[in-house]
Regions:
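Domain-level recognition of soluble alpha/beta enzyme cores
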Residues: 247-272
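Active-site-proximal alpha-helix that buttresses catalytic centers in soluble enzyme cores
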Residues: 38, 49, 134-215, 249-253, ...
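Nudix hydrolase/Nudix homology domain
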Residues: 31-32, 94-152, 236
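Generic beta-sheet signal
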Residues: 138-139, 226-234
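N-terminal strand-loop-strand
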Residues: 1-35, 138-143
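Short, well-ordered beta-strand micro-motif
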Residues: 12, 26, 84-88, 106, ...
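Unchanged
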Residues: 40-66, 70-124
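Conserved Nudix-box catalytic region and its N-terminal flanking loop in Nudix hydrolases
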Residues: 18-61, 150-160
Length: 276
């Protein structure tokens, strides 16, 4: 639906996972109590939009956990979709009351449910409670668009991103901060390395992620042994088998897309797929 309004936000939490507190905001224009969210800017990645809106409305930086069910409702005659995530507060620049948001309270889930204006927000709290809040994200990325293989005269491993692929890499760089990866790993192919470069340096090149050297046993062990948040870029011929080996899920990614595998004690508890 081309007329669909898009927005994004998060249920921001802090404290112990067994008894978290969530951030509830008051919007004077609507006189409602809700969770931080807002409309996406033109061309903005939905994950980047969620990070931005949370920071603008609360002053907080969050690390996103698993996605929560999206909310749909009509706003001024147009259907609106709001994507939400669980978001652990990792930094706080301080809440500044303003015209859009004038109050913020940290509340236990039970008190937050009683304070919230909308039933769909109460539904987000219920979704928050049914699965672990803390997880270790593994972001598996298919390299961006790199033109046609048969139109490249040089060595295939040197084939670079094309303009569309560069744009995809730039959008990926706005989404990856949500997961705060400590390890960046890539196939040696230029198009894979270039897909991660806009996010940051320190990329470890790993031949087992290449099309030529992938191994159905060694490659999943290599990636599965990562115990911290990580982003890994590889190929369309490598990633489906890798994702299945790690999660048991059949996930196919178009160029520039990525899957987020949320892991708890080494076990994948949730798989999400996003485009750029």
């Amino acid at each position: 639906m081309t007329d669909l309004l898009r927005a994004a936000g998060a249920v921001v939490w802090r404290g112990e996972e067994s008894r978290p507190e969530v951030a509830v905001i008051h919007r004077p224009a609507y006189d409602d109590w809700t969770f931080p969210k807002g409309k996406l800017k033109t061309g903005e990645h939905v994950i980047a939009g969620a990070l931005r809106e949370v920071h603008e409305e609360t002053g907080m930086t969050v690390r996103l956990g698993r996605a929560l069910p999206p909310v749909h409702y009509f706003s001024r005659g147009r259907l609106k979709r709001v994507d939400y995530w669980a978001g652990r507060m990792v930094a706080d620049d301080g809440f500044v009351p303003g015209e859009e948001v004038d109050e913020l309270f940290w509340l236990p889930a039970e008190e937050a449910r009683a304070r919230l204006t909308y039933e769909w927000d109460a539904g987000l709290l219920r979704a928050l409670a049914v699965a672990p809040l803390e997880s270790v994200p593994l972001v598996l990325v298919r390299h961006g668009s790199a033109g046609a293989r048969n139109e490249w005269a040089g060595e295939d491993a040197l084939r670079p991103l094309d303009p569309e692929g560069a744009s995809q890499a730039a959008r990926l760089a706005t989404a990856l901060p949500a997961y705060r990866p400590e390890v960046l790993m890539s196939s040696p192919s230029a198009r894979c390395v270039e897909t991660l470069v806009p996010y940051g340096g320190g990329i470890k090149v790993e031949p087992l992620l290449s099309e030529e050297s992938q191994d159905p046993h060694k490659t999943p062990v290599l990636v599965g042994d990562l115990t911290v948040a990580a982003a890994v870029c590889s190929h369309g011929k490598v990633l489906p088998a890798l994702i299945h080996a790690l999660s048991g899920k059949d996930v196919h990614l178009r160029k520039g897309a990525f899957a987020v595998l949320h892991r708890l004690d080494g076990r994948v508890v949730s798989v999400e797929r996003y485009t750029t």
